[in-house]
Amino acid sequence: DKDDLRKIVDDPKLNPEQKSQQIRNHPAIVRAEKEMAELTPTVDLPNFGSKEFVETRQFNVAGKTLQGYEQGIEELYKGGRKLAYEEMGLAVPINVLNRSVKNQGEKIAIINIGPPAAGKSAIANPLAVKHNATIVDPDEAKKALPEFAGGIGGNAVHGESKILSEAVKDLAIKRGDNLVLPKVGGEVDKIRTQIKELQGNGYKVNLVLTDIDPDLAFVRMNERFLKKGRLINTDAADAYRGKPEITYNKLKEEGIADGYGKIDTTTGIGEPKQVYEDTAGIFQDTAIRLRQNRNYGGAIRKDAGYPEYRIESGPKDGLIEILVD
């Protein structure tokens, strides 16, 4: 069944919409979703939240077996400090884990929203490196829990991973870190509340939308399942469909965040990305390769008070590649 699913995902003759239609109700997906549904959510365990549970909870972070929430949260925090460098294949600077080195400048938080498998990490990682920021990602907390079981237990640990990531975020705020927060962004009220909370803690908050065709995101989600064993229930993915963009547009209309950025993640990691909007120089001075059409229409503000992107020459009406070192 998985081999057949892989053929669909890899078929160059099918567009994302056609692949999406064939993937839905595929036997391999139906079977995996059934297995997921049979697992008990960890937040429903009889002793969840008890003193004993908190003190004896098992974690595995970066190959280290840990016991207790205190150790687990501290190790997840350290992982969030290093994550961007490790995923980008960069050496981790010494000061990244040096707690005596405090953030002396303006505190920045970037909330990066987009559907599952939208390629948020391709944007979040360079932004985290730019700002020496801690990435707080519930998906990283999921991996640390034994019930995750390589991915099939993603739903079972979903609730607990959110609790853990909130604790990691609170720790990072307490330590004055800059933050990058990848989220789906399916609920406007939750993102609005998050922005206000961060601003109340002295952060300048930028909201970033990773924009992608919903069918392509769905295909990538199932491709990730084949490669890594991680699966998001189809019904849940459908429930998120189109919601991050609604959230972005609504909050931009309200003007609640301090800056807004919208970037297309249709292309793969390392390939040039199309910027549709950047009101605060969010994507400037990062390792993200950007591209821009000359008939772009001014989506990047020219009066934003920061240097314009360095543009390399290109054909008159074609794409102009913007390289940001």
Could you tell me what each predicted segment is?
Residues 62-99:
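N-terminal pre-Walker A segment at the start of P-loop NTPase domains
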Residues 100-106, 172-173:
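Phosphate-binding P-loop
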Residues 116:
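The conserved Walker
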Residues 123:
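Hydrophobic positions on the alpha1 helix immediately C-terminal to the Walker A/P-loop
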Residues 133-135, 140-196:
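Conserved nucleotide-sensing/catalytic segment adjacent to the nucleotide-binding pocket
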Residues 201-221:
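Conserved phosphate-donor/acceptor-positioning beta-strand/loop module used by diverse small-molecule
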Residues 219-325:
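Conserved GTP-binding G-domain of TRAFAC-class P-loop NTPases and closely related GTPase folds
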